[in-house]
Amino acid sequence: MPLLDSFTVDHTRMQAPAVRVAKQMRTPHGDPITVFDLRFCVPNQEILPERGIHTLEHLFAGFMRDHLNGSDVEIIDISPMGCRTGFYMCLIGTPDEARVAAAWSAAMEDVLKVVDQAKIPELNEYQCGTYQMHSLEEAHEIARAILAHGVGVNKNAELALPSDKLASL
């Protein structure tokens, strides 16, 4: 099985909350695609609660589009990581980490403005696979924690696992 890019970085040295360019590539027509690691929690030390991350998934994707999409950027998808320590964001364009961090912080402010669980988008059995597994309170706690800590930057060069270490794992 090929080694995926996300497993070539040292998770024991990741900071959170932090933005990291996880991958860059081009479409067959030459358009740039960037995948960002939006790390909410320090790996193997913290984990996002399932109801909170699910609610955040419904809110975060729209709010990030409000703050980041423009003439040079279009978000394709934002999805939670299986390890529940953050989200992956795939987009067309090459915004720098500072721009993504600012959009992320603004999106967290927007999450805090949602005060009624009934206002969570797509919160129904027709549009959500587990529509009863939500917690606006947990989403608010996550947003407050991000804003309290501020969003930093993780750099691949600083997190790269040496080839001898990768070979031994």
Curated annotation (Swiss-Prot):
Binds 1 Fe cation per subunit. Fe cation binds at residues 54, 58, 128. Keywords: Autoinducer synthesis, Iron, Lyase, Metal-binding, Quorum sensing. It comes from the Bacteria. Gene3D superfamilies: S-ribosylhomocysteinase (LuxS). The keyword Lyase applies. Homodimer. GO terms for molecular function: iron ion binding; S-ribosylhomocysteine lyase activity. Its EC number is 4.4.1.21. The keyword Metal-binding applies. It catalyses: S-(5-deoxy-D-ribos-5-yl)-L-homocysteine = (S)-4,5-dihydroxypentane-2,3-dione + L-homocysteine. The lineage of its organism: Bacteria, Pseudomonadati, Pseudomonadota, Gammaproteobacteria, Aeromonadales. Signal peptide: none annotated. PANTHER family: S-RIBOSYLHOMOCYSTEINE LYASE (PTHR35799:SF1). This is S-ribosylhomocysteine lyase. Its cofactor is Fe cation. GO terms for biological process: quorum sensing. Belongs to the LuxS family. Involved in the synthesis of autoinducer 2 (AI-2) which is secreted by bacteria and is used to communicate both the cell density and the metabolic potential of the environment. The regulation of gene expression in response to changes in cell density is called quorum sensing. Catalyzes the transformation of S-ribosylhomocysteine (RHC) to homocysteine (HC) and 4,5-dihydroxy-2,3-pentadione (DPD).
